[in-house]
C-alpha cells in the first residue's frame, strides 16, 4: 500500500501529525529556505500516495498551480490545507477552481462556526472515501465525529460568512485595522511591554504583535490568560522557548473583545 506523503519542507507545520497518525510517512522536498519544481518532483516515488500543500506558506516554495501540475503528471492527488486561509472570501472559490483534488478548511476561525467542524471539498471519489470514516463505519475517523447540531451550526455560519459583499468585507478589514491601532496605543507604554506594533501584510490579515521585556515570559503569560473567565486563548505550539511575544489576530475576534484582552494584560502586568 502506498503510504508516502510529499510535503515541501518550507511548508512544515504542527498539523502534519494528521498524516503520520494514520500510518503515512512524510518525505520532505527542498529545505527551510524554499523548494524548486525539480526538488518536489524528484521526491516522488512509487510509494507516494499524495502531495500535501499548506496554504499558509502559499507564497513560499513551489506554487499551488505548479504543485497541481506535478500531481496530475504523476497521477497523484494534491491535498490543500487551507484551514485558516479563507479570507478574502474569494479564496474559497479560488481553491475550488484551482484543480486541487481535496481542499480542507476550518469551520471555526474566520468562518466562525463550531471550532471542531471543517469543510472538505474536491473530487467526488475522494470525498466518498473520506465518508467511509464516518458513521455507521468504525474507522479512524470514529473518534472525530461531528454532531448533527454542529453541522447545522457550520452551515449557518458559512451562509453568513458568504453573505458578506466585497464592499462590506473592505469595511470589515478597515475596522480590524482601526481596532488594532487602538490596541497598540493602549499597550505601547504599558510596564513590561517593550514594543507593540500592527502587522498587516494583507488587509484581511491584521495582527498586533506585542513584545515583552526579558523579565516576562510570554509563554507563562499565555497560560495565565487561558485561566481567565472568559478564557483568552494564546496559541503556544509554535512559540519558541525564547520567543517573548504574543500576537492578537483580529479575524478571530468579535468587536469589543480586544478591550477585554487589553484589560487582562494591563491587570497581569501591573
What are these regions (language model features)?
Residues 95, 164-169, 236-244:
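Intrinsically disordered, low-complexity coil segments
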Residues 1-166, 173-174, 184-191, 212, ...:
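Conserved PLP-enzyme active-site core in the AAT-like
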Residues 5, 269-270:
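An exposure/low-complexity boundary signal
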Residues 188-268:
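Conserved C-terminal alpha-helix-loop-beta "cap" of PLP-dependent enzymes
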Residues 180:
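Flexible glycine/proline-rich
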Residues 177:
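Active-site glycine- and acidic-residue-rich loops that bind
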